[in-house]
Amino acid sequence: MGLPTPYSFTDPLNPTPNPALESDEARVAFWEKQAQRLTWAEPWHTAHRFEKPKSLGFDEEGIEQFSIPEIKWFEGGKLNVAYNCVDRHVEAGRGDKVALYFEGEPGDREAITYAELQRRIAKAANGLLSLGVRKGDRVVIYLPVIPETIIFTLACARIGAIHSLVFGGFSAEALKFRVEDTGAKVLITTDGQNRRGKVVPVKVNADEACSGENNIEHVIVVDRTSASDPVAHAAVPWTEGRDVWYHDLVDDQPDTHAYELHDAEDPLFIIYTSGTTGKPKGLVHTMGGYLVQTAYTHALLYDLLPDYVDENGVLRPDELSAVNDPEKVESTVHWCTADLAWVTAHTYEIYGPLVNGVSEVIYEGTPNTPHYGRHFEVIERYGVTNYYTAPTLIRSLMGAFPDGPEPGKYDFSTVRLLGSVGESINPEAWRWLRQHVGGGTAAFIDTWWQSETGSTVCSPRPHDPAFAPEGTYPEGTPHCTPLPGCATRAVPGVSTRVVDEHGDPVEPGKQGFIVVDKIGPSMARTVWQNPQRFLDSYWRHYGERGWFLAGDGAKEDEEGNVYILGRIDDVINISGHRLSTIEIESALVTHPAVVEAGVCPVEDDLTGHQAVAYVTLTDEGKALTEDELKAALTAHVREHIGPIAKPKDVVAVADIPKTRSGKITRRLLGELYQGRSLGDVSSLQNEEALGHIAQVLVDTGRVSEAV
């Protein structure tokens, strides 16, 4: 069964390069045109509707209240996301094209064509239906980077179940929160995962996460690590009547499935991101708008658009085009190195590459197993053209190969595009990757976006003059000079501003707040079961103007290029993973050694930032040595949240500095640890705590002298 012929929309825009999308009408028309990238069963009746927050007056405590923002795109339109990502490519005669190149950490490999992927998704969809999963039900997927993760993700999209992927490195407690918060009916997990040459048990975490009160009816278990070992297979913990092996569920299922049609505004997935209150926020993304902007930005940033000849006689992609260049699609092998649970992978490792019909690589393990050249081997083996990764990973490769890989040892000749995501990249890492993996000529897209925006907001373009051979463009041409660590400008169809707390523009070079003042279709619609938190987190400050507050600091140069400066709230960005300081503090104070905790970010050459914990101690804690305390508390955080959240250091202090309203001054804690000037401390209720902490840091050799 195929969808009807795509509805023919009127093209409201003149297809010229670099369109000025200044008006709301032009912006909406642009996204209507880009929506033609997808196959729709029924057209929409309303392209876009945005109800900005409006003041509702003041409550009894004098706090201004606002209405909840409402964001809609392509209302009335019907489609199937999985059909758009897989089936339509098969129907177009491209079923034999490889969709996924999978490489496991132990070295096992598999090439899965679009036709085979379609078959496996159908069997998984039928399996979910046999367990009673229906449209709107939530399915939590707790799997490593393996084909089954993508298969179940698209099976959920196919039947209209809402998927929520959870990072395999998260603890049972973190998984349990997501299982309970989503009200999931099914949890999909694995017996174990391969990590740094070892098999790490996973099913035990899943079982712990399902303890207590929840809505879990079934746990599907993928046999990843014990299939060849009957003893290990039999030792996997099991709950009869609830647990089912993946192969037992799907082997006898039909390999075809008559998919359903879904409204453009039906929820597609829930993705959790840390917030300043400690409790992760479940952001809801919807089917139509998310897939439209994902399809377009993937095509724009990874060079799939058709070219035109510019005024300098150079081929450049037509940024307005709603179709891709077939030859570019066929020649692309895309690799986004993110874990599939992160939004980076949702957009540019699952949905983006597949909706555009390219081949992509997924790799299960760590980049240094069994050696630091593993990623280089993967690039060479599959002929990777696009390598999209995180600054932390680049810095780790720099540490292993300061002067680059041994000349001639690896073939990087296929690499034509590099990308960075998750945090600001330092210029040294930018230059190192471009020189040693990109041959000094590859385009480098330094992307800025968030879980909330769903897809890239700001980025250089692959064919910017900066990446053309020297002399191609006249001096003074916009974007002619490479700017390492610069997100440059917004992609077409959205726009940003850098403003002060009053919403006024800041001077070039001065730090302000970056806001998205014209949103695109992939913007999150709400926080799961908590629309008030959606308002308070993102829209309260500038919402009446229709501006989304991203929570990042930024600055612009004289030419309007955007530089992202990091978080303005109490979230730590560690290797591109956003973690709440309060969430870490909450874990620390559950340990019997700790009375109170204050956690702050400090700069780190490898991961960008790390967490440092200041703690006041109980008598039990005071009986521990410094090393014993650090070991106990880092292990405790690892168990409660996950390894990524463990503090780099633990400092025992007599008191935690706070404002007069009782808020921990995390900024000051970070400045103290890094030996920096504190500035104004007049708002503190216990200023003397600063002097004590400064002396502790000196006495323990952490800083050379007190500030």
Regions found by a protein language model. Give the residues of each.
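Conserved pre-ATP/AMP-binding loop-to-beta segment of ANL
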Residues: 96-98, 220-221, 237-272, 279, ...
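Structural core segment of the AMP-binding/adenylate-forming
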Residues: 154, 158-248, 390-391
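AMP-binding/adenylate-forming catalytic core of the ANL superfamily
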Residues: 166-192, 206, 380, 387, ...
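AMP-binding/adenylate-forming catalytic domain of the ANL superfamily
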Residues: 221, 606, 639-664, 676-706
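Conserved AMP-binding/adenylation subdomain of ANL enzymes
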Residues: 292-333, 341-385, 400-405
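Gly/Ser/Thr-rich phosphate-binding loop
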Residues: 351, 355-358, 385-388, 400-482, ...
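Conserved ATP/PPi-binding loop(s) of AMP-dependent carboxylate-activating enzymes
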Residues: 474, 478, 489-493, 504-539, ...
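Conserved beta-loop-beta connector loops within the AMP-binding
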Residues: 490, 495-518, 555-559, 622-630, ...
